[in-house]
Amino acid sequence: MKILLFVTLIALAFVALCSAEGNVVVLSPDNFDTVVDGSKTVFVKFYAPWCGHCKKLAPDFEILADTFAPVSNKVVIAKVDCDQADNKALCSKYDVSGYPTLKIFDKSTTAKDYNGARSVDELLTYINNHAKTNVKVKKAPSNVVDLSPSNFDSVVLDKSKNVLVEFYAPWCGHCKKLMPDYEILGNTYANEKDVVIAKIDCDAADNKAICSKYGVTGFPTLKWFGKQSKDGEKYEQGRDLDTFINYINKQAGVNRVKGGKLAVGAGRVEQLDTIATEFIAAAAEVRKELVKKAQTVVDSLPEELRTEGSYYVKVMKTIAEKSIDFVTTEIARITKLVSGSMSGKKADEFAKKLNILESFKSK
């Protein structure tokens, strides 16, 4: 009897686990009436796995479920896969003819269609209003600088910084569409001390004079304020991430890829690459002269490149003292170090060292 009870409990636990994905409750004919019982507000997504709009909505729907999880006694975020044979009658019952279809059961077993915007903020506001709750999304720290009259000049007109500014309005559809990629852009350049990704809300009364000053008449307007010119060059290229990144890399003289890692070749200096190639093929006496030649090049480099330049010289001296095997062992050592959870400036430093060491490998 005890064994039977134990097995039954395990089975029930398994069913419970299968009825949720994260904090999104998975509905089926077996549990629909139990969940949508009129005791709480239930927001349901009727979807199909192959539907492109459904796939696009999925991450935000999970955020929505996570946000309402602390008040799950009042609000449930759920979904029904209408592509599953067992669920087709359920989807038909609620007149689902396209995907995704969103419906709210407002402490009732009667559904109301939701036809508003599908952003997290819009959905959150809608459900809060119906359920009389006041939950808020915990937003991740942003690497996009918010501008206002109090900091615009100190950030944008700083001649030591390259600054991309988005002039936007919160109600603007194109601005909303750009927002996720613009956040990724901010993350991509977070470790570049000379590059700033910023935005200013032109709908805010205090900001209108600034937006007018820079000739903003439509949204979003993007302007580049480089170190050499603070007039604000209008950005008129594509708004996809790759185009943004290529533009900023070229304008600012940096070498980032999406997400913030350094691209292959970052930290390399062409003149020193040439000397490195000569160095590995040269005899001992010639190598001494090449070290001096490399140091002369380093001394002539801009301040921001001298750390990398000095590493070329350090590698040359180490090879001269030990052997060319140093390159292989050092690459292995650094690769092992960066394979962990290293990030930020240290990760950049080691990435540049790896790139420089590649220039000493036998061609």
UniProtKB/Swiss-Prot annotation:
Cellular localisation: Endoplasmic reticulum lumen
Main location: endoplasmic reticulum
GO cellular component: endoplasmic reticulum; endoplasmic reticulum lumen; lipid droplet; nuclear outer membrane-endoplasmic reticulum membrane network; phagocytic vesicle
Signal peptide: 1-20
Domain of life: Eukaryota
GO molecular function: protein disulfide isomerase activity
Disulfide bonds: 51-54, 172-175
Ranges of residues in domain Thioredoxin: 21-132, 133-285
Residues the record marks as active site: 51 (nucleophile), 54 (nucleophile), 172 (nucleophile), 175 (nucleophile)
Signal recorded as keyword: yes
Record keywords, A-Z: Disulfide bond, Endoplasmic reticulum, Isomerase, Redox-active center, Repeat, Signal
PROSITE patterns reported in the protein's UniProt record: THIOREDOXIN_1, THIOREDOXIN_2
Its EC number(s): 5.3.4.1
InterPro entries, per database record: ERp29_C, ERp29_C_sf, PDI, PDI_thioredoxin-like_dom, Thioredoxin-like_sf, Thioredoxin_CS, Thioredoxin_domain
A GO biological process held by the record: protein folding
Reaction equations catalysed: Catalyzes the rearrangement of -S-S- bonds in proteins
Function as written in the Swiss-Prot or TrEMBL entry: Participates in the folding of proteins containing disulfide bonds, may be involved in glycosylation, prolyl hydroxylation and triglyceride transfer.
Family of this protein: Belongs to the protein disulfide isomerase family.
Protein name, per record: Protein disulfide-isomerase 1
Organism: Dictyostelium discoideum
Gene name tied to this protein: pdi1
